[in-house]
Amino acid sequence: MKTIMALDEENYKELLALWELSVTATHDFLSKEDIQVYRELIGETYLQSLTLFGMRVNGKIVGFIGLKDQLIQMLFVHPNYMRMGLGKALVDFAIKEYNVTEVDVNEQNTQALKFYNNLGFEAFDRFEKDDAGKLYPILSLALINKS
């Protein structure tokens, strides 16, 4: 199993590049312009407000998770490493070590919804707009069944 390590500001550039690769592969509902807007927000604000952990392969970060209290704020895996258990390992780590119980997911991101449902999370709330005020509905999910 890959080792999960804490990440900090020295990793932000690499995390932003990984975020963009992952979002481009999984968030087909976002325009290129929106991706650029979110990239700036994440780089300037979001990363600094989160507790970050990641996994490396051959020295490169291939997956990371961002936590705030007991909420998963972001989870991204390099497209070449998706469906290999990295995301599950990061979520399991967050649940075990940080007692994570919730996650927010774009409603249009059906892959992520299925992923979290399979890990025991279920929707309990819905917001019409995301944190940036854009019309990308957000579903709040709570951990119902610890697997």
Regions found by a protein language model. Name each.
Residues 51-63:
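Conserved beta-hairpin
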Residues 96-108:
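Conserved GNAT acetyl-CoA-binding A-motif
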Residues 83-96, 114, 118:
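Conserved acetyl-CoA-binding loop-helix of GNAT-fold acetyltransferases
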Residues 17-43:
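Conserved GNAT-fold acetyl-CoA-binding loop/helix
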Residues 104-106, 122-139:
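Conserved catalytic-core motifs of GNAT/GCN5-like acyltransferases
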Residues 71-82, 106:
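A short, internal acetyl-CoA/4′-phosphopantetheine-binding micro-motif in the GNAT/acyltransferase core
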Residues 53, 65, 70, 75, ...:
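Conserved GNAT-family N-acetyltransferase fold
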Residues 2-17:
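A short beta-loop-alpha structural element at the N-terminal edge
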